[in-house]
A protein has these predicted regions:
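Long, contiguous binding/interaction regions
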Residues: 26-29, 57, 92, 130
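Conserved phosphate/anionic-ligand binding catalytic regions in large, soluble enzymes, centered on
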Residues: 48-61, 322
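N- or domain-start disorder-to-order transition segments that initiate the globular core
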Residues: 1-43
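Internal helix-turn-beta structural module
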Residues: 303-341
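Glycine-rich phosphate/diphosphate-binding loops that line cofactor/substrate pockets in enzymes
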Residues: 37-45, 251-256
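Active-site-facing alpha/beta catalytic cores
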Residues: 66, 79-244, 265-270, 274-281, ...
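Conserved, mostly hydrophobic/aromatic
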Residues: 52, 261, 326
Length: 343
């Protein structure tokens, strides 16, 4: 039992220097980041749509998707604000399987972390500079935050990480919105405790030194459904659950109440077409209740170029992890959201 060094110490500064945003690209990102913050705080009433592939396994397929999404964003910009999922690290239930671009930048070759780190920055950089979109990623490894803190505009803490103290404390120092998912058990208290920790100042050791954070007022809820003790999925985007979550926001006195509905995972039972119904039902719930309309203001949707999933990367733009909506269904769903909001 041991840690075995497999290479020299990685120079993160040198890797970041290769993909620094130009002054023009930085201005674009900062403008979009301000818009996103205004949406999170309620100053901007547009719907947030965090959307993109389950995992970013193929740079060219992801870029093709990003170009299409950028064009779609322009069509719906007055009602919907899109941040593209560029998810580069994937949690695995038992440690097996594809772990994301950071581990394996080329799915036909053996894992390579040094190449993976470069590939992660390259992909976020290209999406921003070539499409004008900004990006979201899952903070699976808090120690890797320094790799992308200047590029990623939205961070998510996953269902398996939300109870972890380091994730919570690091989230409290991030200068960007952090969505915190309910755990797979569905326990909303665990998630809200995580949000409380993230919204408050914390002192801890990070990268070898003692740090104090300012607290992150944009830490917020992502409802992703749950799995019960019998292994059956239990959605939590329903009317009563939303009111329960809103009541917890009020009781705990948290800042900027905001609920994002994860339309896949256990809200859809990983039946990718069900994502459309989840969105539709949530929009109805918003119409029925003013508190829900004021607080439930976003969706996280898994979508790619081709419908479904595959075990091996044979079809260009088809997920190799969770099944996703293909492009035609993605476009139709976004247009349906837009039409509903325009009524």
């Amino acid at each position: 039992m041991a840690f075995i060094e497999k290479g020299q110490e990685i120079d993160i500064g040198a890797i970041k220097a290769e993909t620094q945003l130009s002054a023009e690209a930085l201005r674009l990102k900062e403008r979009r980041d301000r818009e996103l913050a205004d949406i999170m705080s309620g100053e901007d009433d547009r719907i947030l749509l965090v959307i993109g592939p389950c995992s970013s396994d193929n740079e060219e397929a992801v870029l093709e998707y990003a170009l299409r999404l950028s064009a779609l964003q322009k069509k719906v910009a007055d009602k919907i604000f899109m941040v593209m999922r560029v998810y580069t690290a994937k949690p695995r239930t038992n440690g097996d399987g594809y772990k994301g671009l950071v581990h394996q930048p080329d799915t036909s070759k053996a894992p390579s972390l040094i190449n993976g780190l470069q590939a992660v920055r390259q992909l976020h950089y290209r999406v921003i500079t070539e499409t004008g979109l900004t990006t979201a990623d899952e903070m699976l490894y808090p120690s890797n935050l320094v790799l992308v803190d200047d590029l990623v505009s939205y961070h998510a803490v996953g269902a398996r990480s939300v109870e972890d103290q380091e994730h919570r404390f690091v989230a409290s120092g991030i200068d960007a919105p952090v969505g915190m998912k309910n755990p797979t058990s569905g326990n909303l208290g665990v998630m809200f405790n995580g949000i409380y920790a993230a919204q408050n100042k914390q002192t801890f050791l990070f990268h070898g030194q003692e740090v104090e954070t300012s607290g992150n007022p944009l830490a917020h809820v992502i409802l992703r459904g749950a799995v019960n003790e019998y292994g059956k999925n239990e959605p939590n985007f329903y009317y009563e659950t939303l009111l329960n979550a809103i009541e917890r926001y009020e009781t705990m006195g948290l800042e900027n109440p905001f609920i994002l509905i994860d339309t896949n995972h256990d809200n859809s039972g990983k039946q990718y077409m069900e994502q459309i119904r989840v969105v539709r039902k949530t929009l109805q719930n918003r119409d029925w209740n003013e508190k829900i309309k004021k607080t439930v203001r976003g969706f996280m949707t898994e979508s790619y170029l081709a419908d479904g999933r595959q075990n091996q990367p044979e079809v260009f733009g088809c997920s190799i992890t969770d099944p996703c909506l293909g492009w035609e269904n993605t476009e139709a769903s976004a247009e349906e959201i837009y039409a509903t909001l325009t009524k």
